[in-house]
Amino acid sequence: MNFFDIHKIPNKGIPLSVQRKLWLRNFMQAFFVVFFVYMAMYLIRNNFKAAQPFLKEEIGLSTLELGYIGLAFSITYGLGKTLLGYFVDGRNTKRIISFLLILSAITVLIMGFVLSYFGSVMGLLIVLWGLNGVFQSVGGPASYSTISRWAPRTKRGRYLGFWNTSHNIGGAIAGGVALWGANVFFHGNVIGMFIFPSVIALLIGIATLFIGKDDPEELGWNRTEEIWEEPVDKENIDSQGMTKWEIFKKYILGNPVIWILCVSNVFVYIVRIGIDNWAPLYVSEHLHFSKGDAVNTIFYFEIGALVASLLWGYVSDLLKGRRAIVAIGCMFMITFVVLFYTNATSVMMVNISLFALGALIFGPQLLIGVSLTGFVPKNAISVANGMTGSFAYLFGDSMAKVGLAAIADPTRNGLNIFGYTLSGWTDVFIVFYVALFLGMILLGIVAFYEEKKIRSLKI
């Protein structure tokens, strides 16, 4: 049998009451595999953001060149989310992402050696960071698939929210871990910010490869809905016996909710990545903060995001799955926090702003993914989540990295959009406001579809 297949075995006839007692222990094995793997992926993703000021100073890269390297990741990551998501649906997604983490770690390790021996070889740096994007692309969709196979619908928001803290934790400590490793083992050289975290990720990938099951039916149990006596979604019933391509055409390509969520995610990511990616550079160039304070901006943003992951999924569960309404509330509050951020001048004000922004923007970032699990069958969750991610990274993330870089870069003349030239950090924040407004409108449509779905299932 294929190493990456789900190996379901005949039902053992274990009473449902016994399965429920054993469920948490077995679920936690699978859960913590995807949790730690995804956390490790952020150690070898956010290290690049933390290294940006050092890459400019030590290697001589420009702001725009850093943007192009980031764009390579965005494009491959975005395309890979859908293409690899289609491939992994119906397979052992838990095992697949452990294997992909190993490949990702090896790639970043090579990137560190390239920086050490060759310096700023732009072509090679773009290829390697783009390859890292391919290997990491399906981490989120695969994790959603594994957790959705185990978690009951009425508790899915909180478990996916708790899982979402994995990249908040990984993202929060990535800069500190990378900088500590560089200072301790590489005499402060920026190459250590790539080599050290990649070794940690490699060890985690190897350690998690054989732990846990991807589906209760691999244990000879009933499906999750039967274990918890929940109604089975119409999509999961109707999709039985359909080919993967038929499922993709009907429940992904032909599903208007998925398309609306895809476009909504673009606007969410313009704000999320725009703040997250450029905060260190913004405070160092515009507010003249020290390098240490610049790196710490990532920490405060990610700690705020940690709060969001724990809070908003649980709140949406309490509202019986009304994910879009909660997401709209978060985006509305962000408009006020962005205003505070633009007027912040001290380290404390900036860090408070970033904490609040993280606590709010990761609400819709999480809930868009949770929302789509209610509109597609389980064996299409990876590709559905991947497709929203593809839109987010190909359009939202790339705009945030290259578009906003062109607007903010003081050595350039700004970016011309519809005859209007956007230039400077003030115009960057105007882009955020437009994205928030459009995102709220689209999520309002999704909220309508969610309400119909909830009432049809009589939750």
Q: Could you say what each language-model-derived stretch is?
A:
Residues 46, 74-82, 172, 302-306, ...:
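Residue-level signature of mid-helix packing/kink "hotspots" within the transmembrane helices
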Residues 128-166:
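Cytoplasmic helix-loop-helix junction between adjacent transmembrane helices
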Residues 107, 121-138, 349-363, 367:
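Hydrophobic core of transmembrane alpha-helices in multi-pass small-molecule transporters
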Residues 163, 167-216:
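Helix-loop-helix hairpin linking two adjacent transmembrane segments in secondary transporters
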Residues 90-101, 317-331:
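Cytoplasmic membrane-interface "Motif A"-like loop-to-helix N-cap segments
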Residues 48-52, 254-309, 396-404:
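Extracytoplasmic gate region of multi-pass secondary transporters
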Residues 102-119, 332-345:
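C-terminal ends and interior cores of transmembrane alpha-helices
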Residues 322-371:
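C-terminal transmembrane helical hairpin of 12-TM major facilitator-type secondary transporters
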